[in-house]
Amino acid sequence: MPYKKQKAIRSNNNKCHLRPNDRFGFNIVNMKTRQSIFLFLMLLSTVAGAQTLTRRAYPTPKVTPEVRHIRSMMKSIRVDASGVTLPLAVDNSKNKFFPPVINQDGGSCAQASSIGYVFTYEINRLLDRNASASADNRFAYKFSWNMLNDGEDQGGFAEQGFYLAQRYGMMTESDYGNSGLYQFRWATGYDKYLRAMHYRVKEILEFNAADIATLKRWLYDAADGSATGGLLTFSSQSSGWTINDHYDGPSKTGYHSLLTQLATTGAHAMTIVGYDDLVEFNDPDGKMHKGAFIVCNSWGTFSHDKGRFYLPYWFFTDHQHTDLSLSSQMQAVRVTTYEPKAVFKIKIKYNSRNDLSFGTAFRTDGNTTSTPQYSYAQAFFNAGGDHPMQGQYLGNEIEIAIDASNGVTAASADGDMFFLAVKKAAIGKTVGDGTVEAVSLVDFRGAEPVEYKCVSSALPTAVKPGVTAFYVQPSDNRKSNYTVSASPYKYVENGTVSSRTFGIRTADGKTKKMKFGNMSPDGQSLDIRYE
C-alpha cells in the first residue's frame, strides 16, 4: 500500500517520531531533532554525490507473445555512414526538443525512456517545439506505464510503449496530470484521450547495438540528413555497476561520469542521447579504447553528472556480455500526427477494469442483426489490474475515447453505422460489475465535428459477460427535434424507459416503428428513434 500523508503529532519527549509520507517515506515530527536531521541529510547528499546511486532492482520482464509480436514488426536499420562526415561529438539532450531529466517512479524505466524521452523528443523534433516550454509538449510516461503494468509496480519493455503510441496515441503531461506510484491512475475525460490520439508512432526501428557507425549516424542526423538526430533506447542491468563520477579524461561534451563496469542484476532501460569520440576508457586488461555514448538516465539530475554518464562503445562491441547485462539491440521511432475520422465517446462505471476491452466496427448496409467484425483498441485492452476504472483507491467512473476510424469511408452517408463492443472477460482475481452510462459517436468527416448520441440502447446499460453491443446511426440523429406530450405510462416501465419497440401510425396511414431512450433524470426529455 502507498503511504498516506498524515498530520504531524506533537511530542513531549526527545524521541523523533516518524510518520509515513507518500513522497519521502517519513515526516519529521519532533521539532528539536529537525536541525540535526537536516545536517545529516545534507552530509548524506554530499556523500551520495561522490558515489554510485542505486535504486531498487527490478527483475527482467517476461517476453510475452505480445512483445514477440511487436518485435516481429520492428524495422531493422543499417545505414552506410561512409558518405557522411560525422562530428567528434553529438549531444541531443542539449537541444530544445529534449525534456528535463526525469526522476522515474517505481519500475517505469522503460516508459520513462521510450515515452518520456524518445517519443517526447521525436514529436517535438517533428513539430519544432520546445519540450521545456510547456507540459503540453511533453508526454506522460505514466500514461503508458499504467496501461501496461497490470496495475502493479513492475517493469516492461520500451517497445510496448512505442506500440501503444502507434496503435492508440499518447497523452501529454498536461492532460495526464499527477499520479501517485501506487494509484496506477488512468486519466478521465474524452477531450484528453482525443488529444492523445493525435500523437502517433509511425514505425518502430531496431538497431544492432554493435553497429556503432549506424548508431552514431542516427544520433547525428536520424540517418536521413535531418538537421538534428534521433535518440535511442536500450536496456542493461543496473544494480552493482561501477560508474566513475570523477572522470577527468578527454571529452568534447564535458561530462564527468563514466561507466567502467557493467552491473550484474536489476533490469533497467535508459536513453542514448549522443556520443563523444574523445572519451577514453581502459578495459579490464588495461587496453585503452576511445569513444562513448552519452546516456541519460531517469533517476533525476542528482544522479551521475546531471543525470548523464558516458557508456564506452567497447561494452557493445566486446561480445562477452549477455543480453541481460547489456542489450544487443536498441530501438528508436519515427513519429507522425494523426486525425481520426470518427471517435466513440464513452462514459463507463466499473470496478475491475482489466475485465474490459473495447472494439469498434463500421458498416454502410444498415445491417444491425448480424455480428460485425470488431477491431479492438490497443488501450484499455484487459489492462490496468483489478482496480476501479481510474485506478487503485480512485473512482469507478471514467470517460474515455475510442478511435472508430477503421474502415470508415471518407464521406458520410445515410447508411453509415458505427458499432461499439464493450467486452467483459473474467481476468484477474476479481470479476467486476458495472454499467455503460453514456455512448455517443463524434464524426470528424465534415467541416465541423458532429456528435451523435446512441439511441439504439437504453442507458445506463449493465455490462454483461461477453459483448455488450451498441450502435450509432448518424441518420437517426439528423431528424428535427420536436417537443411532444405523452403520458409517461406509455413509455416508462418501473421508473425506466421501456426497451420495447412501439408501433405508430402516421398521418398518411403508414405504420412506423418507434423506440425510446436516454430519458433525462427529471423525466422532461428523452430520445425518440423511429424507422
Specify the residue positions occupied by each region the protein language model found.
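Surface-exposed, beta-sheet-biased, low-hydrophobicity segments with strongly acidic/polar composition
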Residues: 484-531
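Aromatic (phenylalanine/tyrosine) cluster motif
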Residues: 3, 24-26, 38-40
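Hydrophobic h-region of N-terminal signal peptides that target proteins for export
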Residues: 42-49
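Bacterial N-terminal signal peptides that target proteins for export
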Residues: 29-37
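Predominantly the structural core of cysteine protease catalytic domains
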Residues: 54-57, 105, 111, 115-119, ...
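Substrate-binding/charge-relay-adjacent region of secreted/lumenal peptidase catalytic domains
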Residues: 73-170
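N-terminal zymogen propeptides
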Residues: 51-92, 343, 446, 461-465, ...
